[in-house]
Amino acid sequence: MAGLREFFKETVEEKLLQQMPDDVLQQTTPATQLLEKRRELEQVERALATQKEDFHVRMATLDQRKAELERKEYQLQESLLKFDRFLKENDARRERAEQKAASENEVAQAREEQVQNLRAELRSLQERKTRNRDILQRYSIFEAFMQTVLGEYPEYNEVQDVITRYKTLVATQQDLRSRDRNNQTEIERVRREMARYKEAHRVSMLDCSNKLATLRTAKERAHTETLYWENQLSAVQGAASKRTLLLGQIKMYAYPPAHPGTCPTRTWLALTREPRCCHEPPR
């Protein structure tokens, strides 16, 4: 009997008495709620049919047990009569008969208790059946509404088609949410990778800037040194030019041309020729 109660509790009572959470009711549409109620009604009907069949089987078993109990009671009466005769005939038989009667009384008492338990369970099942009938009557309005919905949407021939469509949409929504989570994870990974690349680029640019500053400093130092040596070279060249000019002037004054009209080439040769002694006559 405990197994029957557990089966009923698992298949009917919990499915009928449980209430959907408020947040789920707010998120679902009336049509979805009707589909859910329709599914629960079908499950209740199947469970009630199973319970009804099981109840008939158990009632038949109970009737058999009751008949057996009546037969045993009749046998007990016969045994009591025999017990009286056995008491007069033999004390030993009387003792055995008493033991047998006591044993049968225990069995009868146990069976009577079992009958009482079965009757109590039967009353409980009848009460639950009444409650289930009331629940079915309350849910009948949802069935009527579902039929109205089917009339307004001819693309759905049966309620099961609507339920199948709903399940498909739910599965699609779950798949899209899973893809969105995967995409968010990939985006976060790319962002972290980009941040690492930016940091590496910043460090590289900073290093290049430091190297560029060092090279610019070296360039400025080299440019300063170049200007210094160019100035030195210009000074040396200027001094050399002045000395060459002075030497030319000295030669011109020291060796004037012999007479006007002298060939310039000879005059230049005369100026560039090594000076002779003043006592050496010109050639």
From Swiss-Prot:
GO cellular component, one term: cytoskeleton
Matching InterPro entries: CFAP_domain-containing, DUF4200
Entry's family note: Belongs to the CFAP73 family.
Signal sequence range: none
Chain segments annotated as coiled-coil in the UniProt record: 31-139, 174-204
Protein name in UniProt: Coiled-coil domain-containing protein 42 homolog
Keyword vocabulary terms for this entry: Coiled coil
Domain of life: Eukaryota
KW ATP-binding (keyword) present: no
The organism of origin for this protein: Monosiga brevicollis
